[in-house]
Structures are given as C-alpha cells and as structure tokens.
Amino acid sequence: MNRRDFIKNTAIASAASVAGLSVPSSMLGAQEEDWKWDKAVCRFCGTGCGIMIARKDGKIVATKGDPAAPVNRGLNCIKGYFNAKIMYGEDRLVMPLLRMNEKGEFDKKGKFQQVSWQRAFDEMEKQFKKAYNELGVTGIGIFGSGQYTIQEGYAALKLAKAGFRTNNIDPNARHCMASAVVGFMQTFGVDEPSGCYDDIELTDTIITWGANMAEMHPILWSRVSDRKLSNLDKVKVVNLSTFSNRTSNIADIEIIFKPNTDLAIWNYIAREIVYNHPEAMDMKFIKDHCVFATGYADIGYGMRNNPNHPKFKESEKDTVEKENVITLDDEEATSLSYLGVKAGDKFEMKHQGVADKNWEISFEEFKKGLAPYTLEYTAKVAKGDDNESLEDFKKKLQELANLYIEKNRKVVSFWTMGFNQHTRGSWVNEQAYMVHFLLGKQAKPGSGAFSLTGQPSACGTAREVGTFSHRLPADMVVANPKHREISEKIWKVPAKTINPKPGSPYLNIMRDLEDGKIKFAWVQVNNPWQNTANANHWIAAAREMDNFIVVSDCYPGISAKVADLILPSAMIYEKWGAYGNAERRTQHWKQQVLPVGAAMSDTWQILEFAKRFKLKEVWKEQKVDNKLTLPSVLEEAKAMGYSEDDTLFDVLFANKEAKSFNPNDAIAKGFDNTDVKGDERKIQGSDGKEFAGYGFFVQKYLWEEYRKFGLGHGHDLADFDTYHKVRGLRWPVVNGKETQWRFNTKFDYYAKKAAPNSDFAFYGDFNKMLTNGDLIAPKDEKEHSIKNKAKIFFRPFMKAPERPSKEYPFWLATGRVLEHWHSGTMTMRVPELYRAVPEALCYMSEKDGEKLGLNQGDLVWVESRRGKVKARVDMRGRNKPPVGLVYVPWFDENVYINKVTLDATCPLSKQTDFKKCAVKIYKA
C-alpha cells in the first residue's frame, strides 16, 4: 500500500469509527463508494476546519478532514471527528415543549409537554406581545450566537432591528470576542485581523498570550508545531499563561504570570523598546502610519454600580463596592502614578460612562506612561509561580522582550480568552498592537498581533453581520445616522425605522430580566444560563412569574431546563448555512439530511415568528425612554407600497426581491432544502397546515442581500454560488481575489486605493477624529483627522476587582478542554468524548492539595461570595496551576462553575472576565 492509499484508508476508518461502524480494511473502498460525500465546515471552534461529510439513508454516517481545505489540510481534532455523532444523541429534542398544567394551559410552574408548532408559536406570540405592549421595544431580548449560521444571524438581526425596532439582541460572542472587537475598532478603525493563518508558516516566532492553542485551536497548533519542529533552532515558541498547560509542551519559554499582570508585561516590553532599544523602533512606520493615544483609567469594572441592589447577597457587596471606588496598593499606585496618586488613596471611578473615549498624545507623554514598568517592578508584580525564583522570571521577561525586539525576527502574537475575558480586555488587546506597531511588525507576512476567535462564526455572524446590541452589518452601528440610513435603504424600510439607541449587551439582558425591564427573552444557538457568570441570579430571574423564556435548541441544556417554551432546532448539516472563521475566511455548506423529528432551522423559526406581526403593531410610535420616542413610520410605509396589515414576514423576508430567487436553483440540485420546499416529513407548520416551503431560495436571498452592506468599502464578500465551488475565501474579496494581509498595499486592494503611494493604509474610519491631550485628559475639543492611521495606545496596569483574601485564598479561572465544546450540550452526548472526559475537574497544585489535606480525586467544594459547586480534584492532570490558583472548565452542567464566577466585565467591551475571581476550597 502506498502512502496516499494509507492516508486515504486511515481517514475512512477514522470517519467510520465516529459513526459507530466497524469497517474491515478489505471493504474500505466499497464502503466509501456507498456513501455520498460533500464538503462542509466543522461545527466547533473558530479555526474553521473544512470537513467532508458522508450521508447514507438519510443520516450523516461519517465525517473526515477535507484534504483540499487550506485551513486544516485533511486533519481534524478529536471533536472534529465526531461531527456526525453530535447529531444523534438519545435525548435530541424533536418536538416543541411547553410548560403546561393539567388543563393544557400554559403554566409557569407546570411540566413540559409536547405541543405542535402552531401551539408553540401561539403562546410565544401571546407572551411576546404582552411584554412588548407593556414595556415597549426595550421589554424583549434575544440571546444570539457566534454559532448562528450567517443567514440565521442576519435574519435575526433584521427581524429585531428593522421589524421589532429593538436593539436588545446580543450574541454569546459578547462573552468571547467583544474585547477583541473593541481593540480592533479603537486601534484600526475597523474590525477583524490584518493577518491570516499563513503567518504561521512564515514567522520565526509564535508567542501565545492567554491562548492554550494546543487544546482550544488544536489544528492551528498542529501547524505551529510543524513550523517549530521543522526549524528547531530558528523558530521560537513562548507560552504566557496563568497556569501551565499543553501549549507549553513545545515552548522554548513558559511564563507563568499573576492574573491581570499581562498589562504590566506588555508595558515592560514597550518600555524596553522605547527606553533601552530605540534603534529597534520603526520610526518611519510610526510617523507615516500611527499616532499615540490614551484614555481614562477610572472606568470601573462593568459590575452593577449599586452595591445595595436588593438582589445581592450580603457576601457579594464588598466586591461590588469596587465598581465605584478602590483603595490603591503600592503596585497599582505605581502604575497609575502619572495621575498623581499614591498608595492608600481612594481611587474613584469617575469616567464609567465614557470608558471608550480616547485622544491623541505625544510620544513624550506615551514614554512617560511607560516609565514605571522597569524589569524590577514588572517581575515583582507579575511573577505567578511561587516555585520560580525572581531572577529566573526576570530572565524570561528579558528573553521575551528580546524576541520581539530582534530586528529581522518575524513575530506573531496569538491570544484568545485569556486576553478577552478580562476586566481590561480591550486595553490588553490594544497593548498587543502597541508593541507590534512600535517595531513595525504588523500587517506583514509572518508578523502581526492576531486575535484568535473562539466560535465557528463569531467573526462571520456576530461581528460581520452585526448581531450585537449596538451594531449593524459591515462594522456599522445603530448610533450613526448615516449607517441607519444605509441599512434602511438596503432593507427597504422607511427612514427612522431603526432605533438609534444601543440595546442591552448580553449580561445586561440577564440583569434586565432580573430587574423586570425585560420580560420576554428568546435564546438561539447558545446556552446563556450555563455560560453567564453569577448564574444563581439569572436562574432566579428566569423563574420570575412575569418572565417568559423561549429556548431554541437541539438538546435540553440548562437554559432549556429553566425555559418556559423549548423549540427543537435543526443542527448544522440539517440546513444550509455559512460560517466565517478567525482569518476572515467565509465557508458555505449545503443541507445534507433532513432534520430529526419535527426540528426546524432557526431561520425558519425566525421567519415563521415574523408572520405573527403586522406593521401597525411594530412600526407605530414607540417610547424607548424618557429622552427618546421612535416615530410612527406607517405613513412612510404606505408611500412605499406597504399596507399596515402587511406582516413583517411579507416586508422583510418574502418581498418581491426575495421571491425572485429560484427555488430550483442549479446549485441546490440533488440536495434537500427544507426551508424552501418542505420535505417528506410533512411538518405541520406554525399555522397548523403542512409546511411546503417558502417557494423561493431564502438562504441565497439572505446572503445576497447581506453582502450588499460590505461591497465597496473593505468588507466585500463573494456571491453565493462562488462559495459552493471553493474551500472558503478571505474577505475582502475583490474581483474574485481574496485578501491575505489587510492594510498592506502589496496585498490589500483597499489599502492601495486609500494610499497608492504608501506601503500601508489603516483605512478603517471608526473614531478617526481625535482631540489632543496628555496622559490625564484631553486638553481641547478641537478634533483633527487621523485618516489612514492606526493608534498606539498607552494603557496602565490595573488589578482585578476581586482578588484572593484570607477568607477566599484562591484565584479561580474557567475555560474549555480539548474534548468538549462550550457547555457540553452536544459533546457530552458523544459516548467517546464523554468517556474521555466525563466530568469537569478542579485542577490545582499538589502543594495546595497537601496543605488542604486532599488526595487525588477527592471531591471538594469550590465556593465564592456568590455560590458554590462540588468538583473532583486533579493535581496530576494536563493543567498545572501554580500555588494559589485553581482551574475548573465550564462544559459540565453538573459542575455548574458559573454559579461561582463574578459578573465583572471590561467596561469598554462589556465582556465578562471569567478568568479571575476569589474562591475557597474545602473537602466535600
């Protein structure tokens, strides 16, 4: 057998084992011939691996890596090989479920009973309109997802913002990528990375910051490993983390730092460059393409600013008080010394409402801000492992700085949740660009700061589509009148339809439910009651008698269990869709099989719900708050040819343009399309009649309308058919050509267009009008343009609002593991993955275990000021925390760790810090 056949047969055997099949080696070829294969995308992380799917007799029977996919080149991680099995768990949701009493009436305290789609939508409509009519456009909320397909997210966004006129839609990507978004927008004026995965094969140095790539992005890590092992002497790998993990296995340097001190380490590197190695600075790059900037430090921590809120327990209040004022210790006072403060001072958070404000400063001011971050200070502040000597830690910091500084060395900095889930997450994202810009090592092949996405379409859907509470597609925002006008024209809705006031971010939707400001919430493609910090509050809020919770899901996770109505959703290969990955690569797939039971796609659910609303119910005058009332746009609608009795479905989704998309399009030949044509299941739809399809190619319509937003200004996407012929394209796609490196005029059409005689153009236009100031504040109100330039930010080191104490002596960090995805709703139902990791463990150091009298495998309580959970101790596992820190993954609903975590956020991004709170550990 030659190498080619060996690889081929190994792939088939691996795929077959996923589906529970045993295939004799002599039958591999015949078995494959009996399956129908097609290209698709992996359901899991933001890497965006291409896979091949085999279907037979109406089921997905196997998956394997796609050798033609440039991202993964035929490889899959362990989760990727189980894309088939996630679809067929024993408790897959197959019918709508409504809480009812014995009379068949909705009852908040009742038990779940199966109902028809019509009955489900009847109750959903009733409860929505009750909240909407009582509280207005702010009284309802939608928990969206970075796992929406692009079309699903676009439909949800359009229904919410053009239909219901609410901006209370926000994705779980708020939990994973919001700080990265702010970092991009504040620095570049536009979202998403300048580089691409090709940087891995071109770089000399890979530095990971709060990114356990070996487990969280394993296929990318295989490329990093290959690069390292093929060039052992030249290529260097550094892993910076708060605990030792698998990413350190091939690292030349492992740096274990105290939580939050990554801020100090970045400033140390910048200080080394500016003070001790000024020759390393790319002064031409800086002068031509950058300005220096800063913002306020006294911005709070995204907690409630009322420690006496009636829902707080007494034990929570001392942490929440820090939202308004903190007492500075020596280390924090030193970092903030430019503000004239000293240790022991009360530091009031006076600029909570303008956390994102920034202004231009001089290089001299920037240099002044960096002054405290000497090697001595930074090492003392940041050293995270008590077993390591201060001198050894200093040497590592120096080696790290030298790798960045080395003149001809290419450097890629990768990060994920360690940066983003951070009370200063936006700042630390900006700091990464700070160092790369100082050295001129950004937007170049093999060099750049690169934010890795966690979810499969956090980029493609949450960010690019704009399913955030403040956004519209293609980096537009609801607060900008021009952006609203553009959106209204594309959507063919009257002027002033879109609400100009940003809605509640993800965590605030929970808080609004608790406060009675929102009384209806719809969850799609995520599990907010498991994935949101301080969960005891939100469980209680869900069960408030006035609140009605709808959860669209494929399995009964925690969110479904606290809901009032559960809608069964089609899974990934049971529908048409598209995802966008971390390197701006957009990939499409076709529906491979029919959904299980009576499950239907989230797109279908959105469109069917839209049928329940007439224009006169939603486009009337609507009060938002005491300062804003949305005008009635019904007269303008009539002038556009609409009737006040038209439904949102008619206007937004089944309009004349939509109906022009041929349901028998050649691209769909040989494939099911339940949304377009119905299917052999003969599902009884939301009107009680057999659903026979919409009669037009709805997914193609949604795609082609959506791409209009980005054409011509740096967000260009290819047409629908093109993506079904290729293994994805990295946008902007101009004249059929994808873009590898943005902002570089050699590679980026828009950079060349913006600055034809320059090497670079940072052409994003967000927040490119600045005032001048110093480190403390802006000095005048006169704005000037920094067109085509990026910002080099100074941001100070600040500590987390809750830190270990005598009563709660441990740091707690949460995160994922290789074998499971997010809340485990899918992967915990795959027998092989469940057997591999059946429960979430409490990883801790052996020294801490000995001190507490614990043995390997003992059950302990992990308790914070907010709640406690029971977990099994692991002192010898893959994750090795230093003394004083424990790590508990969040995939296991039986180890409900978000009952323990703190709901503090980055005030700029509103992203929760899941990595830092204080706990005590004791034997159960």
From Swiss-Prot:
Cofactor: [4Fe-4S] cluster; Mo-bis(molybdopterin guanine dinucleotide)
Domain of life: Bacteria
SMART domains referenced in this protein's UniProt entry, alphabetically: Molybdop_Fe4S4
Start and end residues of each 4Fe-4S Mo/W bis-MGD-type domain: 35-91
Cofactor note: Binds 1 [4Fe-4S] cluster.
Cellular compartments annotated: Periplasm
Main location: periplasm
GO MF terms, alphabetically ordered: 4 iron, 4 sulfur cluster binding; electron transfer activity; iron ion binding; molybdenum ion binding; molybdopterin cofactor binding; nitrate reductase (cytochrome) activity
Gene Ontology BP annotations: Mo-molybdopterin cofactor biosynthetic process; nitrate assimilation
Subunit structure: Component of the periplasmic nitrate reductase NapAB complex composed of NapA and NapB.
Function description: Catalytic subunit of the periplasmic nitrate reductase complex NapAB. Receives electrons from NapB and catalyzes the reduction of nitrate to nitrite.
Recorded family membership: Belongs to the prokaryotic molybdopterin-containing oxidoreductase family. NasA/NapA/NarB subfamily.
UniProt protein name: Periplasmic nitrate reductase
Organism field: Campylobacter jejuni subsp. jejuni serotype O:6 (strain 81116 / NCTC 11828)
